From Swiss-Prot:
Name listed for the protein in its UniProt record: 2-succinyl-6-hydroxy-2,4-cyclohexadiene-1-carboxylate synthase
HAMAP family named among the record's database cross-references: MenH (MF_01660)
Annotated EC: 4.2.99.20
Role according to the record: Catalyzes a proton abstraction reaction that results in 2,5-elimination of pyruvate from 2-succinyl-5-enolpyruvyl-6-hydroxy-3-cyclohexene-1-carboxylate (SEPHCHC) and the formation of 2-succinyl-6-hydroxy-2,4-cyclohexadiene-1-carboxylate (SHCHC).
The species this protein was found in: Klebsiella pneumoniae subsp. pneumoniae (strain ATCC 700721 / MGH 78578)
Family classification: Belongs to the AB hydrolase superfamily. MenH family.
Keywords, comma-separated and alphabetical: Lyase, Menaquinone biosynthesis
An annotated GO BP: menaquinone biosynthetic process
Gene3D superfamilies named in the record: alpha/beta hydrolase
Keyword Aminoacyl-tRNA synthetase: no
InterPro entries membership: AB_hydrolase_1 (IPR000073), AB_hydrolase_fold (IPR029058), SHCHC_synthase_MenH (IPR022485)
Length: 252
């Protein structure tokens, strides 16, 4: 089994850019950024429970890792940069925390490397379970209206919230709930030590208005890139700045 994906071919010799979206997003989330790199072959994935992979279920991060590796193998992708936002960033960090022969670099935007104490894990597990129950039972428009009131999205204005609620409400609530719990931050290892031992470049992008993840970034052994005029979803808020940042990273 492999993940649903869209492919844009590039020029021979360039490593692939493999894009992973955030929770409730899909393969199109990174397209505007990826289109700025026509020389590089690009793979845009739908994570389990999302988009064309909505019917694919996993139990944990190990299941996601297996699917991701199988998908890369199926496209004969042997040299690649892994680029992920939020949930996609956590998937990318989990995947990269184990030896991966073909990985040329890791780029994460607003992804959490893992909780560091049992109390925080329990609180997160309870929180994610409550959200999952709402995704299963309530109209998605109402759930997402509340979802985007969370502190991490504080930089959004009313119009931005309304647009995101409309976009995300196209999802399947039951499959979102399953993925939310399977990849809960409560079930994720603290990846800081394993990522520090990596043998590839690790770049971390963060919106300047995203105070929570700016603080988290300081705990990582990664090159930090602040994206101006952006909150948690930097590539949506300021795609031009993210494109410029990626161009600089990929040219180095």
């Amino acid at each position: 089994m492999i993940l649903s994906a869209a492919v844009d071919n590039g020029q021979p010799g360039y490593p692939w850019l493999v894009f992973l979206h955030g929770f409730s997003g899909d393969r199109n989330e990174w397209r505007k950024v990826g289109d700025a790199f026509p020389a590089w072959p690009r793979l845009y994935l739908d994570l389990p429970g999302h988009g064309g992979s909505a019917d694919i279920a996993v139990q944990d991060f190990a299941g996601v890792n297996t699917l991701l590796q199988s998908t890369l193998n199926s496209y004969n992708i042997h040299k690649y940069w892994l680029i992920g936002y939020s949930l996609g960033g956590r998937v990318a960090m989990n995947f990269a925390s184990q030896p991966r022969a073909g990985m040329r670099g890791l780029i994460v935007e607003g992804g959490h490397p893992g909780l560091q104490d049992a109390e925080a894990r329990q609180a997160r597990r309870s929180n994610d379970s409550a959200w999952a129950e709402r995704f299963r039972r309530e109209p998605l428009e109402q759930v997402f209206a509340d979802w985007y009131q969370q502190p991490v999205f504080a930089s959004l204005n009313a119009a931005q919230r309304e647009s995101l609620v409309a976009l995300r409400s196209r999802n399947n609530g039951a499959t979102l709930a399953a993925m939310l719990q399977a990849t809960s931050l409560a079930a994720q290892a603290d990846l800081r030590a394993s990522l520090q031992a990596r043998d590839f470049p690790f770049h971390y992008l963060c919106g300047e208005r995203d105070a929570k993840f700016r603080a988290i970034a300081q705990t990582l052994a990664a090159d930090l890139h602040l994206i101006h005029h952006a909150g948690h979803n930097a590539h949506r808020d300021n795609p031009a700045a993210v494109i410029a940042c990626l161009a600089q990273i990929l040219a180095s």
